[in-house]
Structures are given as structure tokens and as C-alpha cells.
């Protein structure tokens, strides 16, 4: 069936369009007439349209990130429309600042993208919710008005400290141990120390000082007593114990310095002598090792010159002076007062000892650190306390001192101590973290039941000779260690790491020194005759001989017992322990003979000092 379809004029006719073929690229080859003379501007749907429709300039729904949806296309505003010809609609408006809601105000800063080049009075751009961004000059001027301008901007200048001892050219660096690596060490499950022998006499603590407060302060008295600061190899008891007990020997102060080295900022050094399979850790004679640091870990530690009242060395002397006097003032002293006596007398008191000796007891203990390492150390107690139940507790007494709260960026003790004692202690933990950690380690090593802190402040901020006691506070050593985040496992791990490194070395003399400006310690191999001055005192950088606890030009330094008297006293103290352990000695005959020869030929000097007032009080 054939049909014919007729096309009428009303039917749609398809006409093929003309297609342009661009051989050199893509897109049209010619610009249509409809789009000529029209400027091109990048466009984004999230862009603000300009001043005509910008009625949401101060409104902001997202307070946390006001410019979260800002786009890079908003950078081109040169084609925005501005009505400048018609002035008939000109009128004044209220330009008062709109009070914003306090929702997270000032907590977060907006996205600063696309803010470059938009200075004061700039047109368009993304508004940061009405927030004003200060320029660099404006911020600098504000800081100058507030008195917070520093040479180094927001950061304090680098602190250049001096080393505790000058490194000599003939010293060989054996090992460098940085603090981040040491802080990761751990030696768990170290048993408590076992007593070998105990010596000395203790006085009882006066509980009336627990009631001292800011309104009922007590002046700090000057107690004229002798404190013995004897190093390891000069201790006659340790010399005899080295023949039958242990293979590593030290004092509690030396051990605490090593265990808490990751918290220290100031430089210090310890001498180690390796004889056979034995290590002797010593402090150098006539150094400032026993002086207490002040604000060592503060953000801005004391950095005044040496002649200033608040120089680091003068503050250390003042803190040691306060600590010695406070630890003796809070005791019940007198001939009629009862005293707690240990099995053996003080091994450092000779027959020709002049003056009264401070209340102190020595506990010689040993620890098993595994792998054949047995540590023997001398620990100290400061006082004894009788509880209401009749139990006897041993105390470690220390003093915290306030010197100038404004300079030290601290808390005013006389205003906060009675009401906010926790804030005062927290500030001390921040400024003296290393010192408090070492005190805690010493109390734990000695097995003290309580550690008692005294808060001592200057009577006047510019007078370092007169002080007052504002209060006391006591803690259990283990609980206080947990509060200050002190891990004994890490402390034992650091000590064991250093012992292992030294045990691998050949026999000789070594020195561990904290780098004065870097968080690391170094082990040096030094000649055997280093620091041996043949009776002459080693001079410091200023040409003056160091004097431990030299509080003033008239500080009295008394000679200690002779070598024979000390050896006889020590022999009586450890006779029973040495006889019992003679058969169980683990050292070889050759090593024992070497140690015996080395300890017999050496002398046994002891350092005994009287506490007197600081130099400022005697001028």
C-alpha cells in the first residue's frame, strides 16, 4: 500500500547548525556579538554579591569557623557595583559597635584565607563576623603599652649558661645521652632497700610548728650546728662495706641527681671511678654540688649578675642557709629533751670535734638492680616523730623559700598560703621541679615515713638575712611522688643505664656532666690525676676558691676527724655486717685486693661546715 505524506508549511523543518572546529585548542573560535565588551569575572555560588545585596555582613551563624565556606573567587572585587553618582540618598547612620553574643568569643580565630591585602578601609572580601584584626604595628604598640615587649618577640632570649666544669682538651667523650631517650627508660620491680647498718642520733620534731600560719608567723633562727657533707670515697663506712657488700657505691644526693637528671636545667657533674668490677660515684671537692637551686625550672629563671642580691649563686646560698636552719629549728633541742639513737654513733664525729653537730642519722642500704649489680648508698634522716599510736616515724625536713614573688612571676605567699596552699605548692612545683623531685627521691631511698616542707619567706624583699616561717605541710613520699609525676621505675632505669655504660669501660676515672644549654648528659673519659690539686683548692672562673656553704666571709669551717679516728669509728659501725658477709663475698681476690689497696692509701677527709648568715647579713 503506497501512501504519500504531504508536508505542509505549518510542519517543523530541521536545519543543521553551523559547527565550528577549533584545530588549535578547544572552545569556540569566535566570540559571539552578544558577549562582546563584557568583562570576565570568576564566579562562585557561595560568593557575596557585593554591597548592593550584602545585608548579612555582621550576621554569622557559624561562630567557631566564620569563614569556613570562603572561596578563592572572592578575591576579585574590582567589578563590584558601587553607587557613587547619586548623592540624594546620602544620610548619617549609627556607627556604634554592635554588642556580640559571648558565645565562645575570642576562643577561636577565623579562617584567615583571602585576608591578605585587605587593609583598613578595604572594599569587599569575606568579613570575619565583625572581628577586628590588629595589624603588626598595632599589636606591637599594644605590647609596648602593656610592657611586654621583648627583644626576641613572644619568645624569651636563649639562656646561655656556664658549665659546672670546663671541658679540657684531653677529655674523651664516651657517650651522649639525651633526655628524651632517658625519659623512656624503665626498671620496674626494684625491691626496697635493705639496711646494712645505721648510725647517728635524731631529735624529735616539735609539733607546735604545724600550727604556724601567715597570721602567726615565726622568725627563722640561726642555728649554729655543723653539717657534714662527705662524698662517697671519703666515707669510712662505705670503704669497709666495699670489701663485702655491693659493687656500686654512692650517696643519696648523688643518686637523686642522676635519677632526676631529665628535670634539670643547670649544669652539674659527678666523678665515677672504676676499679675492677666496682664503681664509686663521687662529687668533686669544693664545688657547689650541695647548694640548692632556686627557680631552676621556671619560665624565666634568675639571671642577674653575680653581685646582685638575686643572682643564681646568692639565691642558692640563701636557700641552703634557710634549709639548714629550718631543719634544726623545728626540732626539740636541749640536753633534757629525749633523742633517738641508732645502733652506731655518727661516723664523722672525731674526738677533737668542736661545736654541736646537726641532728642527722645515716642509713646505709643496698639494692639489687639485677644482672649482678648491687648498689650500696648512704641515706639520711633529719628527725623522728612519735605518733599518737606510739609508732616511730622518720622524717625528711626541707624548706621552700620565697625571695621575690614579683620578679619570680610567682604567687604572693602571705595572701595565698592560708587560703590557697595548693596554688602555692603548684607554683613551686613548676618553678622548682628538679629540686622537689630530688628531695622526694632522697626520702624514698632513705625509707622516710613523711617528708615535711616548710614555707619560709624573707622578712623584707630586699633583705636576704632575715626570714620568717609562714607554714608547714607534710606528705608521704610515695604519694607526693605520684602527685609530681615522678616515676621511680624511670629513675631506676636511668641509673641502671649509666651503670651499665660505665661497667663496659676500662678501669679509670670518668665524669658525667649535664650540658649547660642542651637537654643531655655526657660521659667523659678523663685522666686519673684530674681534679687532684695536691691539697690546693681548685679555683672558680672568678679566681676565688669555691667554699661549700660559704655563707659569708666569716663562715667557720672546722676540720673533721683524723683518718685513724674515722676508720676506728667506721670499723665499730660495720664490724658485725662485715663479719657476717665475709664468707659470702662475691668479688674475686684480685679485685678485693685492688679495692683494699686503693682505699687504704687514700686519706679520709670530711667536710664539716657551720651554717652562718648570708653575706648580706654580715655587711
Swiss-Prot record:
Compartment annotation: Cytoplasm
Swiss-Prot/TrEMBL domain comment: The RNA gate region regulates mRNA cap recognition to prevent promiscuous mRNA-binding before assembly of eif3d into the full eukaryotic translation initiation factor 3 (eIF-3) complex.
Region (Disordered), start-end ranges: 99-160, 588-619
Region (RNA gate): 288-302
UniProt KW keywords: Cytoplasm, Initiation factor, Protein biosynthesis, RNA-binding
Cited HAMAP family: eIF3d
UniProt source species: Aedes aegypti
Record GO biological process: cap-dependent translational initiation; formation of cytoplasmic translation initiation complex
Molecular-function GO term, any one: translation initiation factor activity
Quaternary structure note: Component of the eukaryotic translation initiation factor 3 (eIF-3) complex.
GO cellular component: eukaryotic 43S preinitiation complex; eukaryotic 48S preinitiation complex; eukaryotic translation initiation factor 3 complex
Protein name (record): Eukaryotic translation initiation factor 3 subunit D
InterPro entries tied to this protein: eIF3d
Upper taxonomic lineage: Eukaryota, Metazoa, Ecdysozoa, Arthropoda, Hexapoda
Main location: cytoplasm
Pfam families per UniProt: eIF-3_zeta
Family: Belongs to the eIF-3 subunit D family.
Amino acid at each position: 500500500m503506497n501512501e504519500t505524506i504531504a508536508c505542509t508549511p505549518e510542519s517543523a523543518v530541521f536545519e543543521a547548525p553551523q559547527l565550528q572546529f577549533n584545530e588549535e585548542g578547544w572552545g569556540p573560535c569566535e566570540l559571539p556579538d552578544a558577549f562582546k565588551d563584557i568583562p570576565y569575572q570568576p564566579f562562585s555560588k557561595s560568593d557575596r554579591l557585593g554591597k548592593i545585596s550584602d545585608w548579612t555582613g555582621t550576621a554569622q551563624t557559624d561562630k567557631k569557623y566564620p569563614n569556613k565556606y570562603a572561596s578563592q573567587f572572592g578575591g576579585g572585587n574590582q567589578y563590584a557595583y558601587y553607587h557613587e553618582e547619586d548623592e540624594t540618598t546620602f544620610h548619617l547612620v549609627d556607627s556604634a559597635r554592635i554588642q556580640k553574643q559571648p558565645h565562645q568569643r575570642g576562643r577561636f580565630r577565623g579562617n584567615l584565607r583571602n585576608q591578605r591585602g585587605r587593609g583598613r578601609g578595604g572594599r569587599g572580601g569575606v568579613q570575619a563576623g565583625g572581628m577586628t584584626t590588629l595589624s603588626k604595628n598595632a599589636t606591637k604598640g599594644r605590647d609596648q603599652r602593656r610592657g611586654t615587649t621583648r627583644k626576641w618577640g613572644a619568645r624569651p632570649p636563649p639562656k646561655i649558661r656556664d658549665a659546672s666544669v670546663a671541658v679540657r682538651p684531653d677529655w674523651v667523650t664516651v657517650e651522649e645521652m639525651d633526655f628524651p631517650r632517658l625519659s623512656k627508660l624503665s626498671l620496674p620491680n626494684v625491691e626496697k632497700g635493705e639496711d646494712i647498718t645505721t648510725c647517728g642520733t635524731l631529735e624529735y620534731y616539735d609539733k607546735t610548728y604545724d600550727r604556724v600560719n601567715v597570721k602567726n608567723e615565726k622568725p627563722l633562727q640561726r642555728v649554729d650546728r655543723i653539717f657534714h657533707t662527705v662524698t662517697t670515697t671519703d666515707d669510712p663506712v662505705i670503704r669497709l662495706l666495699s670489701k663485702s657488700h655491693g659493687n656500686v657505691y654512692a650517696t643519696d644526693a648523688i643518686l637523686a641527681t642522676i635519677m632526676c637528671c631529665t628535670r634539670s636545667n643547670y649544669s652539674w657533674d659527678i666523678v665515677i671511678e672504676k676499679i675492677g668490677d666496682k664503681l664509686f660515684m663521687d662529687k668533686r671537692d669544693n664545688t657547689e654540688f650541695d647548694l640548692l637551686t632556686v627557680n631552676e625550672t621556671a619560665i624565666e629563671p634568675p639571671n642577674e649578675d653575680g653581685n646582685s642580691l638575686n643572682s643564681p649563686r646568692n639565691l642558692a646560698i640563701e636557700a641552703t642557709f634557710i634549709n639548714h636552719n629550718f631543719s634544726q629549728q623545728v626540732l626539740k633541742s636541749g640536753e633534757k629533751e629525749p633523742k633517738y639513737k641508732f645502733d652506731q654513733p655518727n661516723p664523722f664525729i672525731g674526738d677533737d670535734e668542736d661545736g654541736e653537730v646537726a641532728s642527722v642519722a645515716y642509713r646505709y642500704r643496698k639494692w639489687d638492680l639485677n644482672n649482678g649489680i648491687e648498689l650500696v648508698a648512704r641515706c639520711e634522716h633529719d628527725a623522728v616523730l612519735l605518733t599518737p599510736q606510739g609508732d616511730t616515724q622518720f622524717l625528711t625536713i626541707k624548706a621552700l623559700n620565697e625571695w621575690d614573688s614579683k620578679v619570680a612571676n610567682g604567687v604572693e605567699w602571705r595572701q595565698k598560703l592560708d587560703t590557697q596552699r595548693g596554688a602555692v605548692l603548684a607554683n613551686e612545683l613548676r618553678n622548682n621541679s628538679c629540686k622537689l623531685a630530688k628531695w622526694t627521691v632522697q626520702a624514698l631511698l632513705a625509707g622516710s615515713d613523711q617528708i615535711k616542707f616548710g614555707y619560709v619567706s624573707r622578712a623584707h624583699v630586699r633583705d636576704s638575712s632575715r626570714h620568717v616561717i609562714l607554714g608547714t605541710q607534710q606528705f608521704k613520699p610515695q604519694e607526693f611522688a605520684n602527685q609530681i609525676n615522678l616515676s621511680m621505675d624511670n629513675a631506676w632505669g636511668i641509673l641502671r643505664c649509666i651503670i651499665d655504660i660505665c661497667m663496659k669501660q676500662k678501669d679509670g676515672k670518668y665524669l658525667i656532666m649535664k650540658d649547660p644549654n642542651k637537654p643531655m648528659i655526657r660521659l667523659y673519659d678523663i685522666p686519673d690525676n684530674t681534679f687532684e690539686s695536691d691539697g690546693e683548692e681548685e679555683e672558680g672562673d672568678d679566681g676565688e676558691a669555691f667554699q661549700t656553704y660559704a655563707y659569708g666571709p666569716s663562715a667557720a669551717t672546722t676540720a673533721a676527724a683524723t683518718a685513724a679516728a674515722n676508720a676506728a669509728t667506721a670499723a665499730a659501725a660495720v664490724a658485725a655486717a662485715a663479719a657476717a658477709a665475709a664468707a659470702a663475698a662475691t668479688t674475686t681476690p684480685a679485685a678485693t685486693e685492688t679495692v683494699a689497696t686503693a682505699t687504704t692509701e687514700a686519706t679520709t677527709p670530711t667536710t664539716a661546715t657551720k651554717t652562718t648568715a648570708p653575706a648580706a647579713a654580715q655587711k
